Amino acid sequence: YTTDDTAKFKADVERFAAALLGREPFASLKDRFSVRGVMKPSQERGCDEPTRGVHRNTALGCTFNSLGSERYLLTEDNRAIREAARAVPYDVLSIMVNHTRYGGGGIYNLFNTFTSDNQWSGYVFVHEFGHGFAGLADEYYSSSTAYTDFYPAGVEPVERNITRMLDGKPKWAALTSAGVPVPTPWAKAEH
């Protein structure tokens, strides 16, 4: 966001706060969350897109193609992040990038990133927030690589939302209502 984008930045903060706090479990707990935006103007809007030859002069140095993934959006400029973030107390740090391209990233207890202006931005924000806030794993149903490929046979994943059900039930079985099938069907077509 540039200085000229300040009004848009404020509106986007409100929009994404509503996207997060309008979904469970956050909707039921919204009195426990405080969302604040810190405007750190960039010289140019957007972010780097190295494989497309695009390099922007931005305050936080966000870039697509992180770790070799086209849509993975991260920054390595920890100093710039912490300088901007010190303006307010925080438990979770989300970096909103003024861009139309689909993408984001999330690293547990560090930060999460997302772009502001594509049809999936709200969904991506909540998804990446799950990584940064709760250390949740990806559950890409369309991926050719299953999360079970990342763990040796017989090893239960550390992430709270995935399981190999080594003892015949998911690790969250105590939180599941009676009669809920495992695996639980979901609204896959919406996503």
Language-model segment annotations:
Residues 46-49, 76-115:
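Catalytic zinc-binding patch centered on the HExxH motif and its immediate surroundings
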Residues 1-83, 116:
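Propeptide-to-catalytic entry region of secreted or membrane-anchored zinc metalloproteases
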Residues 1-3, 41-45, 99-103, 119-121, ...:
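Solvent-exposed loop/turn segments at secondary-structure junctions
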Residues 34-37, 92-96, 124-125, 131-135:
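Structural recognition of the beta-strand scaffold that forms the well-ordered cores
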Residues 27-31, 85-90, 107, 186, ...:
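Extracellular/periplasmic catalytic domains that process cell-envelope and extracellular macromolecules
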Residues 6-9, 104-128:
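Short pre-active-site segment immediately N-terminal to the catalytic Zn-binding motif
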Residues 129-145:
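Catalytic Zn2+-binding segment of zinc metalloproteases
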